[in-house]
């Protein structure tokens, strides 16, 4: 007898639980076959769905949605649920849905400090191992927190060592200053929340973080040049919280950002990382489809709709 495909059955139950065809009745959406899956060269731009975009639904739901809507891959936010931290379960989900894992977001957030232990270097090494197992090329990393003194003191050297040892891209994400009720800034990251100032070869641009930091994402694309290795496509304003709005709902002009990426010949991943927390499943699917369409039209993968 064959061993049961636990992740596959979990995915089947997830699909059965979510209705895509009809908002009022459930229906089963089977994953595409190998013959129907679009393949992309390693050097080609990919439009990817972050698993955090389906929260509070599960990582399995992210694969189901990515497959259903036509995303090229999934970026895994490690720590959102148990499956996100299990490379073998992720591999089975990727195979079942025929949607590859293209990036691993290491559990270096404030809310994931105890996922994969508490040693930050062990977390990054484990993220690299997961990426290698799953065939992902990118590990997304947040800068150290101020209280992680030893880690922060050798952060950039350690990132270079990891890249040299693994052959992976460890792309450090831009963050933002924390602000108190009176508007004063709290120093939460070291050496800096601004990844522009870090001596790192590869950076991740998050448009929502740029908005809170009162930066302009288009300018960051230009300033970073070849250091820009990964993009979290979203939107935001300079409010007190990290909003991760849908494209066009904030002040970062994500369309202009994509245009600049195309002008510079960017061939990395454009990852939809938006908040759908307050939405129904039907609304979530529609919002992520609109986000996918927005990106694909701007990068020229689909034609603009006729007016």
Where are these regions (language model features)?
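N-terminal pre-domain/capping segments
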Residues: 8, 20-133, 202, 293-307
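Active-site acidic/histidine proton-transfer and metal-coordination neighborhood
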Residues: 39, 96, 113-202, 305
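Structural preference for beta-strand elements that scaffold enzyme active sites
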Residues: 44-48, 73-75, 100-103, 137-140, ...
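Acidic-and-aromatic substrate-binding clefts and catalytic sites of carbohydrate-active enzymes
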Residues: 52-59, 76-89, 109-120, 145-152, ...
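Conserved, mostly hydrophobic/aromatic
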Residues: 66, 74, 131, 170, ...
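Structural motif
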Residues: 69, 133-134, 226, 264
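Short, electropositive alpha-helical surface patch
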Residues: 152-164, 266, 281-299
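Acidic/histidine-rich catalytic cores of soluble enzymes
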Residues: 162-251
């Amino acid at each position: 007898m064959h061993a049961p495909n636990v992740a596959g059955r979990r995915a089947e139950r997830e699909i059965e639980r979510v209705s895509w065809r009809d908002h009022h009745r459930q229906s089963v959406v089977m994953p595409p076959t190998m013959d129907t899956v679009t393949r992309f060269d390693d050097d080609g731009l990919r439009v990817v769905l972050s698993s955090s975009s389906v929260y509070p639904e599960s990582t399995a739901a992210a694969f189901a949605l990515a497959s259903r809507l036509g995303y090229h891959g999934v970026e895994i936010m490690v720590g959102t649920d148990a499956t996100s931290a299990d490379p073998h379960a992720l591999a089975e989900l990727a195979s079942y849905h025929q949607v590859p894992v293209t990036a691993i977001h290491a559990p270096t957030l404030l809310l994931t400090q105890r996922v994969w232990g508490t040693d930050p270097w062990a977390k990054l090494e484990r993220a690299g191992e997961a990426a290698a197992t799953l065939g992902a090329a990118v590990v997304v990393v947040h800068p150290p927190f101020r209280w992680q003194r030893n880690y922060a003191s050798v952060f950039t050297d350690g990132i270079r060592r990891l890249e040299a040892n693994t052959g992976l891209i460890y792309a450090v994400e831009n963050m933002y200053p924390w602000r108190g009720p009176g508007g004063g800034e709290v120093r939460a990251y070291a050496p800096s929340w601004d990844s522009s100032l870090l001596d790192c070869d590869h950076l991740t641009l998050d448009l929502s973080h740029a908005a809170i930091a009162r930066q302009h994402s288009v300018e960051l694309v230009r300033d970073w040049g070849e250091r820009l290795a990964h993009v979290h496509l979203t939107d935001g304003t300079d409010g007190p919280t990290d909003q991760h709005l849908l494209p066009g709902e904030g002040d970062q002009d994500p369309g202009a950002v994509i245009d600049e990426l195309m002008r510079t010949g960017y061939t990395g991943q454009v990852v939809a990382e938006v908040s759908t927390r307050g939405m129904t499943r039907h609304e979530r699917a529609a919002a992520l489809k609109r986000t996918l369409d927005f990106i694909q039209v701007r990068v020229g993968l689909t034609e603009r709709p006729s007016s």
